[in-house]
UniProtKB/Swiss-Prot annotation:
Reaction equations catalysed: (2R,3S)-3-isopropylmalate = (2S)-2-isopropylmalate
The keyword Phosphoprotein belongs to this UniProt entry's keyword annotation: no
Quaternary context: Heterodimer of LeuC and LeuD.
Entry keywords, A to Z: Amino-acid biosynthesis, Branched-chain amino acid biosynthesis, Leucine biosynthesis, Lyase
Family note: Belongs to the LeuD family. LeuD type 1 subfamily.
Segments crossing the lipid bilayer: none
Protein name: 3-isopropylmalate dehydratase small subunit
Protein encoded by which gene: leuD
Function according to Swiss-Prot or TrEMBL: Catalyzes the isomerization between 2-isopropylmalate and 3-isopropylmalate, via the formation of 2-isopropylmaleate.
EC numbers: 4.2.1.33
């Protein structure tokens, strides 16, 4: 796992609601169990022309050269809905995304993202649309800076908006705490509890 404090990156504007996990990564690419190379198949059915899987769709925003190295995804409500597949998070992260900003996320996708340290930021639809307008008025390839410690998104080095985040999630990401290291913090208490159990439970 990687500690997350602040990230500056190019923002990919994907102004679409209800993007499901099968759109993020189609089911035919879920056979592998390692986390590498899933970025090749991210938004596969949108990135490539139908029936020509090796020809990029020039009308899809991710294929625009300005967004080739995008690492922040700005999108609309209910991102990550549909079936539960951790591969969707792996695909986004393997491609290079560190942050996703949207009005809402599917619950299971949200949990999978936290477990993999993909930062999800929830903002009101009003603020989201304001950010889309900000991008539309600028040259392509605009960058945001996301400061997790301050919980602030900066645009052109100016404070743009404050975001809320679960205190526990924030602490884990700032301090690089995963499920294993979190459990180890309570090692003494766990051993004490186990030692106090009746013999037939040990």
């Amino acid at each position: 796992m990687i500690q997350f404090i602040q990230h500056t990156g190019i923002v990919l504007p994907l102004d679409i609601s209800d993007i499901d996990t099968d759109t993020i990564i189609p089911k035919q690419f879920l056979k592998a169990t390692t986390r590498s190379n899933f970025g090749l198949y991210l938004f596969f059915n949108w990135r490539f022309l139908e029936n020509t899987p090796k020809i990029l769709n020039p009308n899809f925003v991710l294929n625009d050269p300005y967004y080739k190295h995008a690492s922040i995804l700005l999108t609309q409500r209910n991102f990550g809905c549909g079936s539960s597949r951790e591969h969707a998070v792996w695909a986004l992260m393997d491609y290079g995304f560190k942050v996703i900003i949207a009005p809402s996320f599917a619950d299971i996708f949200h949990k999978n993202s936290f477990n993999n340290r993909l930062l999800l930021i929830t903002l009101s639809e009003l603020k989201i649309n304001d950010l889309f307008k900000e991008i539309a008025t600028q040259k392509k390839g605009i960058s945001f800076t996301v400061n997790l410690h301050e919980q602030i998104i900066y645009v052109h080095n100016k404070k743009k908006c404050f975001f809320e985040i679960n205190d526990f999630h924030k602490r884990c990401m700032l301090n690089n705490i995963d499920n294993i290291s979190l459990t180890l913090q309570y090692d003494v208490a766990i051993k004490k509890y186990e030692n106090n159990q009746p013999s037939y439970l040990k």
